[in-house]
Amino acid sequence: MATLYNQQWQQQELRERCGDMKQIAGCTRYRLQEGPERDVEIIDVRTGSGFRFQVCPSRGMDIPFAEYNGRPLCWQSSTGVVHPAYYEKENIGWLRGFNGGLLTTCGLSSFGGPNEDAGESYGLHDRISYIPARDVNVEQQWKDESTFAISISGNLRQTRVFGPNLVLHRRITTSAGSTFFTIDDTITNEGFVPEPAVILYHCNFGFPVVSEDSRIDAPSLEQAPIGDFAAQTQDSWNHMETPQAGLAERCYAHQMRADENGMVRAAIINKKLDFGAYVEYRAKELPHFMQWKTMACGTYVTGLEPSNAPLISRDQLRARDQLTILQPGESWNFQVRLGVLESTLH
């Protein structure tokens, strides 16, 4: 049954109390109107529980914003949700349109730092988050007498002539009363030769989920620091700090322990507010995990980032024989869930 306002409801009971379910839960589509965000499409989703999030068909079907009862869950950068026409492939130009948000997808041919592999150049984190979706479909309807289901889906084709033809089908689902949504992704090689394919879910948690009162709660068996600063502060990998101007970023590669169902949940919890957010995923599909921690003023964010390959550049993956290869006609499936943690949730 739909749990709303500390009570369970059937379809008929809610229909009697409102003329349109959008009064309680549903989707609204609109376009941004000015600056580099002009003409970017947003789908705003409300579940009625206080959980609200946005889906951006113009930018990889990613999640540029989410909140719960007015509390933001994610970090948002100074760039805004830049229109994909402004994408800069070279070097670290990707950062000029990196909004952060609750989710920015990285891939599909490469991720990590700029590099050259087999005569092809790749910018930071590749281009899937800048590709507009086709075949976008929004459904919001009663699935049965007790479930008002919300579903948003679309197709993202990363391709070029004489190059890869990789298609990401993404479906995002939630329901009235929910405090989470689920992403079901399928990557298909629609070309005729084997292609390297990688995906990383760059989940960016921000204030007030992230604060000096916050800790990471994750089944981490091992943390490998990336770089000297991360190594020097490794003992505090799971502790958040107050913002400091100009403080360098830190990254840690984690080995996670899956539960009895093969799932991994990593969360950031503000102990003072008894409030937090999490990412949950299937370890078999996404066996690698990177933590991105930056406690700098303005870039005050912690990324929890599951992926299907180690977060190193494509040329390094090839050198280590760790490229994940998708055969012609083959598909891979991934499932990720993002949601809220609060002691008062019912």
For every predicted segment, state its role.
Residues 1-182, 194-196, 205-245, 250, ...:
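Surface-exposed acidic/polar loop and edge beta-strand patches at domain peripheries
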